Amino acid sequence: MCHNLHTKSGRTVIAYDIDPAPLDRARAANMGVADSLEDIAKNCGTVFISMPSGVQLQLICDGLMPHMTSGQTIVDTTTAPVALTKELAAQFKAKGIDYADAPIARTRQAARDGTLAVMVGAEEAVFARIEPLIACYANDITLCGGVGSGQVVKILNNM
């Protein structure tokens, strides 16, 4: 996903991970690499998050939130509990930061090929801004409703 954003979006992509292997791949692809969540928050207008669970998502958001400012956007691709998604969105919204849940479906190969399916929960204006970025790694993008709706549809998709 990160590689496709880098090669297709026309924007500067800055990666952050606690695992050095993905950062080595990012450097090899001439992407920027951040040293901390604070660096990400201070240097990125749109922040994409992809975590294995809601627990890690909460930790990442707790690390980002103090450093983010009004006008930025979070695009969360994690499959996370709906209640957590809505809670995080409300916390960011209180700071003037937009939040979209955009969980992904399909395979690792689909991620490489840019053919993922993405179910988005966001305000329409936020969706209009982020959809061209999501299209860098997905070819099946659906606005499902407000924040949390992407998670609901992803859960139904997994049943």
Task: Please tell me what each predicted stretch does.
Residues 80-159:
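Rossmann-fold dinucleotide-binding core
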Residues 1-49, 72:
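NAD(P)+-binding Rossmann beta1-loop-alpha1 motif at the extreme N-terminus of oxidoreductases
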Residues 19, 52, 105:
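Short beta-to-alpha linker loops that shape the active-site pocket of alpha/beta-hydrolase fold enzymes
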Residues 16, 50, 78, 120-121:
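Active-site-adjacent beta-strand anchor residues
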Residues 27-28, 46-48, 62, 112-115, ...:
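Short secondary-structure transition/capping segments
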Residues 37-100:
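Rossmann-fold NAD(P) dinucleotide-binding segment
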Residues 7, 42, 66, 132-136:
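Solvent-exposed polar/charged
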Residues 21, 56, 107:
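Active-site loop signature of alpha/beta-hydrolase-fold enzymes
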